[in-house]
Amino acid sequence: LDIKNAFLHGDLQEEVYMEQPPGFVAPGEYGKVCRLNKSLYGLKQSPRAWFGKFSQALEKFGMQKSKSDHSVFYKQSHGGIILLVVYVDDIVITGSDPRGISSLKSFLTTQFHTQDLGMLKYFLGVEVSRSKKGIFLSQRKYVLDLLMESGKLGAKPCSTPMVPNLQLTKEGELCADPERYRRLIGKLNYLTVTRPDIAYSVSVLSQYMSSPTIDHWKAAEQVLHYLKGAPGRGILYGNYGHTRIECFSDSDWAGCKEDRRSTSGYCVFVGGNLVSWKSKKQNVVSRSSAEAEYRAMAKSVCEVIWVYQLLSEVGIKVSVPAKLWCDNQAALHIASNPVFHERTKHIEIDCHFVREKIQQGLITTGYVKT
């Protein structure tokens, strides 16, 4: 669904005034201004006012707002479940209750000016296709537009998004157009929605947004050459007969030569399908590889718990405990062993958090080879 003129429906709680538009001023009323009762496009309050109005309408229908993700609404009944996801004025409705979905669409039509776009094929730049294997998400058109804009549509493809063991630094000749670099990295960052294979490269390149150098630009071009090789690559979601949650966690150690911080990474699978992933530099310096891996495990557990809570809230049964895989034996021992010692006592908070989830039976750990 698409809501027409969505922001104009929002009710303003603040006092906001505007000048009268040209040609609207009546004789003798020059100098008067209008007080807004509804939000307008361009007001900083408009998105919040619109979301509040839309939330009230859904709650009136009987939908509940998810506590784990406020952009997700759900309703459970004897006929099944209805799920609604909203991003500003773009809406996706799905579920196992066809009659309920039809009733919800009719209800929204009475509240707002809506347009039913039919079966989901395109949403926020993400292309959705269906086959016997499952649902496939990609951003092929987005990639091709990006390559054309960057002048790389005819570029020679390469096999990796970043040169192996590449060490970027802040030193070097600055880019002639840093704004162009920032725009490119911003667009690549949005592409990671369906391309986890470039998540690490984009994470590294985004650390040099303030003063990008020519070396940084060349590294960004490497990502474009990699995308040229497979612009339609994406993620397939299929039915594999189970709903187990698995998470793979990893980290390097002191990988950044400038501040010696480590980079964490994880990917979360539900029912054999990849649903969440991230690559990010850690906030503190780790004193050992085990500590770096353990901090990555703590971040992974946070994401696993969030996924579990969201699925449980909307009525999707998942198998517990979730499995957390790591390739560092020392980090796994820290997670399962309640004993503190000199090398781990300063990461006490992370220790308590991960161990608590293990003791509660929500998480089990396992070793996987590098």
Regions found by a protein language model. Name each.
Residues 1-113:
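Metal/cofactor- and membrane transport-associated sequence elements
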Residues 226-251, 316-318:
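Structured nucleic-acid-interacting core domains from mobile-element enzymes and related host factors
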Residues 56-60, 99-110, 174, 190, ...:
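Alpha-helical coiled-coil heptad-repeat oligomerization segments
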